[in-house]
From Swiss-Prot:
Xref: SUPFAM superfamilies: a domain/subunit of cytochrome bc1 complex (Ubiquinol-cytochrome c reductase), Transmembrane di-heme cytochromes
Name of the gene: MT-CYB
Further facts: Heme 1 (or BL or b562) is low-potential and absorbs at about 562 nm, and heme 2 (or BH or b566) is high-potential and absorbs at about 566 nm.
Name recorded for this polypeptide: Cytochrome b
Native species: Otolemur garnettii
Role this protein plays: Component of the ubiquinol-cytochrome c reductase complex (complex III or cytochrome b-c1 complex) that is part of the mitochondrial respiratory chain. The b-c1 complex mediates electron transfer from ubiquinol to cytochrome c. Contributes to the generation of a proton gradient across the mitochondrial membrane that is then used for ATP synthesis.
GO cellular component, one term: mitochondrial inner membrane
Length: 379
């Protein structure tokens, strides 16, 4: 068995990636989220495939086909809710994974970090298009509002929006192409994950202390396979609890009303995992400025490796940076809350203040704190 594992070309690749992989001996549970994201992707592709067997991407029948899945297909309701709530679990794991990378300085692996940002954009695009497919009120109006943002691009904006819509409004052509992209993107994500892992295994994993761990490695199996298994069990327990007890907890009631272009919902909002970016978009009165701020709220992650001026990689021994990090986390939670509120005072003001804090913390306060810590440590 060992002979096959170490010499067969295919088994050798798996062995080097998941069995005999040298891993730091001190990585904590924060390193579990990578494998949990892999599990989420498998769940989403599997449930999505079964949903696609029954779904029809036509404006006249899309809403009815989702109802048919829930009522008439064997265990269709559980497949549908696993897919919808699986997306929420996916984003929870994504945010934790990125948060861990920021806290422990994993962003210094430039290639791995940049592929990760590409993955984040791909997952966000997939989730957005998936939200449009049930063709409820929030699906239709969410698609209309978000795609319309591209019209802020000077000179070519309007043409670009109509090209994406496949007409002069969100209609059958839009739904069909969104379904096609929603189906293909997870497989592109899976390919990007392979590249992400390839670059990660070139350098080896980071660890909580942020110092090289080449002198103290242990094999991935059995130590971290068991650890990842515990994380997977907890994830599945949370997901199934959500699906079986409160499947609509994270959804929007408006999406149980079929799409009606003649009736605008009082408050259009995306899924909860986009609310922080949506709040930043809304906090700027100018349309183009809002779109740029929306894009920068995610793209700013690509700047973090270049803004890192601390002599220590991890925040583990840097209390001032830790304080700022938790300010940033609290700020993102505030933005998420604001994104779900109506556009009126005091929510507008809170959103604007939170947006300023978000950008100034990352672009100004964190680099300055890094320099101050270097000074205090006489480095």
């Amino acid at each position: 068995m060992t002979n096959i594992r170490k010499h067969h070309p295919l088994a050798k690749m798996i062995n080097h990636s998941f069995i005999d992989l040298p891993a730091p001996s001190n990585i904590s549970s924060w390193w579990n989220f990578g494998s949990l994201l892999g599990l989420c992707l498998v769940i989403q592709i599997t449930t999505g495939l079964f949903l696609a067997m029954h779904y029809t991407s036509d404006t006249a029948t899309a809403f009815s086909s989702v109802t048919h899945i829930c009522r008439d297909v064997n265990y269709g309701w559980i497949i549908r809710y696993l897919h919808a709530n699986g997306a929420s679990m996916f984003f929870i794991c994504l945010f934790m994974h990125i948060g861990r990378g920021l806290y422990y300085g994993s962003f210094t692996f430039l290639e791995t970090w940049n592929i990760g940002i590409t993955l984040l954009f791909a997952v966000m695009a997939t989730a957005f298009m998936g939200y449009v497919l049930p063709w409820g009120q929030m699906s239709f109006w969410g698609a209309t509002v978000i795609t319309n943002l591209l019209s802020a691009i000077p000179y070519m904006g309007t043409n670009l929006v109509e090209w994406i819509w496949g007409g002069f409004s969100v209609d059958k052509a839009t739904l069909t192409r969104f379904f096609a992209f929603h189906f293909i993107l997870p497989f592109i994500i899976a390919a990007l994950v392979m590249i992400h892992l390839l670059f990660l295994h070139e350098s080896g994993s980071n660890n909580p202390s942020g110092i090289p761990s080449d002198s103290d490695k242990i094999p991935f199996h059995p130590y971290y396979t068991i650890k990842d298994l515990l994380g997977a069990i907890l994830l599945l327990l949370t997901l199934f609890s959500l699906v079986l007890f409160s499947p609509d907890l994270l959804g929007d009631p408006d999406n149980y009303t079929p799409a009606n272009p003649l009736n605008t919902p009082p408050h259009i909002k995306p899924e909860w995992y986009f609310l922080f970016a949506y709040a930043i978009l809304r906090s700027i009165p100018n349309k183009l400025g809002g779109v740029l701020a929306l894009a920068l709220s995610i793209l700013i992650l690509a700047l973090i490796p270049f803004l890192h001026s601390a002599k220590q990689r991890s925040m583990m021994f840097r209390p001032l940076s830790q304080c700022l990090y938790w300010v940033l986390v609290a700020d993102l939670l505030t933005l998420t809350w604001i994104g779900g509120q109506p556009v009126e005072n005091p929510f507008i003001t809170i959103g604007q203040v939170a947006s300023v804090i978000y950008f100034s913390t990352i672009l100004i306060l964190m680099p300055l704190t890094n320099l101050l810590e270097n000074k205090l440590l006489k480095w």
